[in-house]
Amino acid sequence: MSQFINNPEHTFGFDTLQLHVGQESADPASDSRAVPIYQTTSYVFRNSQHAADRFGLADAGNIYGRLTNSTQGVFEDRIAALEGGVAGLAVASGAAAITYTLQALAQAGDHVVAQKTIYGGSYNLLEHTLSQFGVETTFVDAHNLDEVEGAIKDNTTVIYLETLGNPNSDIPNIDAISEVAKKHGLPVVVDNTFGTPYLFRPLEHGANIVVHSATKFIGGHGTSLGGVIVDGGNFDWKASGKYAQIAEPNPSYHGVSFAEAAGPTAFATYVRAILLRDEGACISPFNAWVLLQGTETLSLRVDRHVENTKKVVEFLIGDSHVAKVNHPSLPEHPDHELYQKYFPNGGASIFTFEIKGGQEAAWKFIDHLQVFSLLANVADVKSLVVHPATTTHSQLSAEELAEQNITPSTIRLSIGTENAEDIIWDLKQAFAALDE
C-alpha cells in the first residue's frame, strides 16, 4: 500500500499524488529517483515454484511484457490513485481501454445501455463492431432517467457514459443514473477523459469503472498513445449472476474465479489476465513512461486549460459570426446546473460552437486559423480545431449526427495553454476572413 494513500497521519493532495504514487522511494535496482523505463519483454523467475505461483496468481508480480511491466505498473497505480480506484490497467490506447472494458462486461447475447452523445469511435464500436459479436446497444438520452431505466432489459449488463460528451460537452447526471444501475444490479462505466480526475472523479458519484484515453489530458502533449482502465472495486460481481466470467471458475484460466482470487480488483485482474493476454493491445514501457511525465503536471496544465477556456467562451458569445456556443458554463446550456455541481472549479475545455454560414463558412474559418492546429486529437497543450461532421463523427448517419446535435455548422475547439490573448487573436482573424 502506498504511504501516500490512506495514510492515518495525513491526507495528501492531488498535486502530491500525481508526483509520487507508484514510486514512493528511489528505484531499488538503480537508486534512480525518476521512474526508469524497463524496456524488456520478459522476467526471470527464481525457480519453478515461483513461476507457477506467478501464473497461478498466488504471487503478484511480472510474468510477461504483454501483461505487466514495472514502468507500466507505476503509471497504473498513479492513475488509479488519482481516480480513487483500487487498481489500474494501462493499455495501448483509449480505444483499447473502452473496447476491453465493454468486452469484459458484454458478451454474445448481452445488451448495453449507452449515452447517445459520445465520441464517434465509441458510438461505432457499440453500434457496429460489438454488434457483430452478438452485443446489442440501446442509445439513450442520458438526461432522461425514465428513458435510461426503460432501456434496461433482462440481458443488460452495463451502462456506459461520458463525463463530458464528445464533442458538445453535455453532462449526464452520473449520480442519478448510478442509482438506477444499482437498482438493477448493473455496473456503470464512465469515460472520464474530458473530465480528468483532477476536476471530477466518477467513482465518488456512483460509477464502478472509469476509462481514459491517456493520450489526451493525462499525457497532455500529443506525443504518445495510451489508455487506462480504473477498477473502482465497488461492484459485487457475484450478486446478480450475470458475470460468470469474473465471478465463477473461468475455464480460460485453469478454473480461477477472479472474484475469489483478486477480491476488489477482480475486474482489472480479469481484463489483464484474459483480454489483454489474448488480444494483446499492451502499452509500451516507453509510452507508459512518457504518459507518467504528463501525469506529473496534470493539475497545473488543466488549470491553464480551464482559465483560457473561460476567456474564449466569453469572446465567442459576443462575436457576430457565432450562432451558438455549446458550453455548459453558460446559463442557457441545458446542463448548466450539473456543470456547477460537478465542475465547481470549471472545466470543459473541449467544446463546440455553431458558426453562421454552414459548412462552407466552417471550413473557411478553420482553414484561416494560425495558432490552432487542424487535427483529430484533443486535450493537447496546443489549441486544436476540427469539423466533427466531416471528420471525427463522419461515420455517423445524418440521423445519428442530428441525435448528437452535430450539424454542418458545428466546430469543435480544444483550448490549449497558449497565451489566451493569442488564442483569441487567432479566432478573430479567422472570423475576419469570412468577411473578405
Task: State what each model feature region is.
Residues 60, 86, 287, 291, ...:
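Short amphipathic alpha-helical segments
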Residues 3-10, 22, 26, 89-318:
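Conserved PLP-enzyme active-site core in the AAT-like
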Residues 2-3, 86, 127, 136, ...:
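PLP-dependent enzyme catalytic core of the Aspartate aminotransferase-like
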Residues 164, 193-195, 330, 356, ...:
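Active-site beta-loop-alpha junctions enriched in small/polar residues
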Residues 280, 302, 310, 314-317, ...:
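Conserved C-terminal alpha-helix-loop-beta "cap" of PLP-dependent enzymes
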Residues 2-69, 77-78, 411:
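N-terminal "arm"/small-domain region of PLP-dependent enzymes with the aminotransferase-like
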